[in-house]
Amino acid sequence: MARLDPHSYNDDTQPETETLTWKARVDFRTRRLHAEATLTLKEASAGPLDLDTRELEIRSVVDAEGKPLPFLVSPPEPILGSRLRVELRPGTKQLTIRYRTSPQASALQWLTPAQTAGGQYPYLFSQCQAIHARSVVPLQDTPRIRIRYRAELTVPKELKAVMAAGFAGREEQGVEALERYEMPQPIPPYLMAFAVGRLAAKELGPRSRVWAEPEVLEAAAEEFEDVDAMLRAAEELFGAYDWERFDLLTMPPSFPYGGMENPRLTFLTPSLLAGDKSLVSVVAHELAHSWTGNLVTNASAEHFWLNEGFTVFAERRILEVLYGTEVAALHAALGRRALEDAIHHFKDHPRLTALRTNLTGVDPDEAFSQVPYEKGYLFLRAIEDVVGRPAFDGFLKRYIESHRFQALTTEQFIAFMEKHLPGVLAKVDAEAYLNTPGIPLGAPAPRSERLEQISRMKGKVPRAEDVKDWTPAEWQLYIEGLR
């Protein structure tokens, strides 16, 4: 048995899933999905196949001919959930699992009408990162494995289902509607995502539109109207955009994150609707994930910095292009303070403040912090400072192109670095970033005239004329400086 991801029952000696066909009926009354998942394997196989599940009620497992396959659901483990072991007959390449989800499924949030902007209809959305896809679909829930999928969602006719995939049609059948989606690019399971509610859309550009409840649609469209320019800037920096569309979904207020980088349909908190586009750095971050995270993916949560450190670096490069180096420096300064707070938070668990972590027996949600984001960013900034921006830009494009649609470990990144930028890791003291707690001595620090102005105001009450044009980032830095 070879389990390379501490947060999955996946056994690397068993066949990988190649495609998923998923059908689900959304039941708002019972807060369940009644579903079936057809897994097509990369090769025909025999013997045990271990899948990740969490609180799924498995009803049957059959092969492509409809013949039952023996299966066993193990007792639940607090972090991993339950292992679904299916015994495959010789030559089995496809299996279908019929099941229903729990009302407490960890990936699903069911909202009452009162929790929505319109107040008339319920709402459902999914959040599968880091290891919650298993509460919706029985599969190999590890980013080491990428799948293509087709999906059919049956929902109340008055509602709209959207997915982080390509739209393939809608059919109304009595009081219900069947929505079809296809994801042609292979994705890690945590990027499966959908939402169901009273939704409307407005086009933003040739490759993007925004979805939202009708009550907030116009505000969302105005706030995010520059997304196409952002997309073009990102392509100049990181190469062609591989996901065809970059649509946005403005979520209800209970969405627990600033944003989630679901491919083709980024989920965003409505708190970004400031009215002046001052908080669109979150959109830049989620867009950057289209290359760093979605295209090149951490092999497990132990290498999360490969997703987030690269993405913060990419986000700030996009901000530089669109809004200038001063704005990027403001965000870097905020990030540095967030990193210092995270390191203090984990003072009793300092190993969690290194980039390369051992998370065996640790829930990735409990280990979540700004460390992989901001310390990872500092590591890449340190490398850029040594080799220079043109050389690092070339390296970054080569890194992305060489690992498209692949999962990567820290060790593989190190090997790639040594091959293409030999000797640089020693110059930046990579050990201090990757394996040592805390902030390395000499880590890059943001500098700009606006940062110096804010620093000079520490402990002072600013004059109205001095701050009349301040952005939220400047106010946040000033207020945090009062601590």
Ranges and model annotations:
Residues 1-4, 18, 326, 409, ...:
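General structural signal for secondary-structure boundaries
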Residues 1-245, 368-370, 385-387:
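Acidic/His-enriched low-complexity segments
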Residues 33, 51, 125, 136-139, ...:
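Long, contiguous hydrophobic alpha-helical segments, chiefly transmembrane helices and signal peptides
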Residues 37, 181, 210-455:
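Hydrophobic alpha-helical and helix-loop surface patches within well-folded domains
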Residues 60, 125, 180, 379-381, ...:
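Repeat-unit-sized solenoid/scaffold elements
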Residues 437-483:
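Long, His/Glu/Asp-enriched segments that create or flank divalent metal/ion-associated functional microenvironments
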